[in-house]
Amino acid sequence: MSDTENRPTNFIRNIIDADLDSGKHTGVQTRFPPEPNGFLHIGHAKAICLNFGIAQDYNGLCNLRFDDTNPEKEDIDYVHAIQKDVKWLGFEWAGEIHYSSNYFDQLHGFAVELIEKGLAYVCFLNAEETREYRGTLNKPGKNSPYRDTSVEENLALFAKMKNGEFEEGICALRAKIDMTSSFMCLRDPIIYRVRFAHHHQTGDKWCIYPMYDFTHCLSDALEGITHSICTLEFQDNRRLYDWVIEQVSVPSTPHQYEFSRLNLEYTLMSKRKLNTLVEEKLVDSWDDPRMPTIAAFRRRGYTPASMREFAKRIGVTKMENTIEMSVLEACIREDLNDNAPRAMAVLDPIKLVIENYPEDKNEDLIVKNHPSDDEQGTRIVPFSKELYIEAEDFREEANKKYKRLVIDKAVRLRGAYVVTATRCDKDEQGNVTTVYCTYNEDTLGKNPTDGTKPKGVIHWVDANKSLDAIVRLYDRLFTVPNPAAADDFNSVINPQSLVTITGAKVEPSLAEAKPEFAYQFERQGYFCLDNDIKEPGALVFNRTVGLRDTWAKISQ
């Protein structure tokens, strides 16, 4: 077992500790069982970190198992995307990838065993009749007229289902449990249905497919899972989980434990609603950096370490709560503050001309990549007579709180000299286009000899050697903390969730930027090169997160 002092603790780990101490289990085997019908989101990241993290900490194993029992909605592309997400988060699964479809023969055998024991029957009620017979939370169900069909006839009917002799929706195999149970999941649930659909793993071998609640527990048993961990919406289903395990001849007896799912402010987690965002072109794709998918966070510049830290901070409980977005943003902000190299980018450029700087002079300034981490080394930043600075970093007049460039006031250019503004040019609309200044050539890396110290520092890029870039300022997709509660969540989409800047200027070192690798743009925030640039050679940077939480003030 790894160092227990650094392990997180929660009620699930307490259960595992007790199971190991008592000898109930001699090792730990968990699993992460996504359905390959879409992209994983940050809620899945929590489950990945929990299941794989437990296996790591207890020197156990965690299986990656695809719950692929619904072929009409599944795709091999999602299988590949999910594998990429798990690996990106820093985890490896035990052995080969598992598929529920690997067990279709065994699952069919278990269904036959239930029929032979008089615990399953083929039912010909249609969907509407099935709902009517099922009852409600306040009204018990009633038995299907097909419930007492003989074992022999049910075996023959199930064989006909398997052989494709019934059309879809005509019949289904149901477990015979208790139609008066207070738990709806025990009112003779469907465990097999007819589907003439091509399967991405088994092809056209099967035309009957098992339901999730039947497949899940038996797959756990076949794989020797010791602790089957899922979210609270499956709490009642645990009774069906246990019933199935008790009724058939399985090689092991797993147990299910539930924890609260992740609810995150300003975010939707419903796959159906996320699909609506994509289908209605409210976002560009499933990996649009405003989406809560793992692929979107990766594209936005989030790091695996920040996601794992987030999962650690929010913990594992049975209590439903909503996590503030600031918790997630703090995790990535802290990670990148410590590890991201610095660079300079001017998003709204105006020209700065140093009038006393020689026309033919060009310098290669050596600038640290990180102010407190010498191991990150240095880079060369070109400097000459003409630079670009941010338009908001200059005013003709300003109060004492404004610590940037003002006429007759001095500031330091980051990593370079102290300059003093003298005058400016404006266009016909009165917008400043060019600022003129003088520089003190003795101030490279040091303060003026007269003892004065500039009160401000601004960033800049060389006007002649800077690179053109597109910068996408991503923000929260919704304007309200709980968009799912809105009558129409389209009405609460943040119109400023994406602001695209096409005229940005960046320092030349960023020509070597790699997709998804984040930089701190000095005084701006954290940005990474997009991983889906349509035009070869173009520089498109996505904002990962700002330097500080601007929403904290908005919400006050």
From Swiss-Prot:
InterPro entries: aa-tRNA-synth_I_CS (IPR001412), Gln-tRNA-synth (IPR004514), Gln/Glu-tRNA_Ligase (IPR050132), Gln_tRNA_ligase_bac (IPR022861), Glu/Gln-tRNA-synth (IPR000924), Glu/Gln-tRNA-synth_Ib_cat-dom (IPR020058), Glu/Gln-tRNA-synth_Ib_codon-bd (IPR020059), Glu_tRNA_lig_a-bdl (IPR020061). ATP binds at residues 35-37, 41-47, 231, 261-262, 269-271. GO terms for biological process: glutaminyl-tRNA aminoacylation; glutamyl-tRNA aminoacylation. It comes from the Bacteria. Its EC number is 6.1.1.18. CDD domains: GlnRS_core. Disulfide bonds: none annotated. NCBIfam families: glnS, PRK14703.1. This is Glutamine--tRNA ligase. It comes from Colwellia psychrerythraea (strain 34H / ATCC BAA-681).
